[in-house]
Curated annotation (Swiss-Prot):
Residues annotated as binding Ca(2+) 1: D83, D85, N87, Y89, E94
Originating organism: Takifugu rubripes
Key word Metal-binding present: yes
Keywords: Calcium, Endoplasmic reticulum, Glycoprotein, Metal-binding, Repeat, Signal
Protein's recorded name: Reticulocalbin-1
Compartments, record wording: Endoplasmic reticulum lumen
UniProt: Ca(2+) 5 binding residues: D248, N250, D252, K254, E259
Residues binding Ca(2+) 4, per UniProt: D207, N209, D211, H213, E218
Coiled-coil regions listed in the entry: none
Top-level division of the source organism's lineage: Eukaryota
Amino acid sequence: MDVLGFICAVFLGTVVLHAKPTVRKDRVLYQDPELLRQATNEDNNSFQYDHEVFLGKEESKTFDQLSPEESKDRLSKIVDRIDGDGNSYITTDELKAWIKRVQKRYVYENVVKVWADYDLNKDNKISWEEYKQATYGYYLSNPEEFDETTDQFSFKKMLPRDERRFKRADLDGDSAANREEFTSFLHPEEFEHMKDIVVLETLEDIDKNSDGHVDEDEYIADMFAHEDRGPEPEWVKTEREQFSDFRDLNKDGKMDLDEIRHWIMPQDYDHAQAEARHLVYESDKDKDQMLTKEEILDNWNMFVGSQATNYGEDLTRNHDEL
């Protein structure tokens, strides 16, 4: 039984299940916005890039529902919130602080949305047993219905992996997660004590021969399925060069855990700072290194499509919610 069949069985009433294993496909946690922007602009597709990177594919639909007038009006109110000192100028630091606040709010609001799906006994904690039942209960009761050879992310493999992550998040060791611990379980990339787990899971996802390393072919296979056996696209050739020049730091032909960490969590890189600088650079008409509300509204399309508007959600919230 594949994952689709499993989901169908759930909705037919066999079991009520709202949860899913903690699978992540996006590897690099702190992408350089400028490098992504350059790659997209080469395809003359920068508007789509703004929507998908800053809004997300699904969240971009929210932006489409707003008229330019509505967007500008609501963005104007957001600018007032960003202007922490009330001097009518938005600095890079203020934008950076806002972007980080928005990201943090997104993480915690996501936990609020799913909390009831896991806290089965309503004691305001989620035990490992509760999480396991909510996520893997059907599989554990009906293992014969699952084809472990074809499921991309087999439940048999994901269960012990989730348990390992849960134990790392459970700082007080009581086998139950409070809200902060459960947040670190669902969003380990946001917590320093969980980042080793993120690196290890990345290795396990890509290391198909289980030798404890990621070689060049495994690195490429994670992003490109060479099904037609034809020539590789240019971007794949570029990624091979990236692997050789920047991923494989010790030049032994493969990546170890430290090199994987350097790849997905580059040191001394602040994504919020980079994004804030980009927004200022693109909107600062008088080049005084600060933005006025007028400058922001004149370039409102960029801010709608940026993390400064919480992937579009802030533009559909009431001002009092912000």
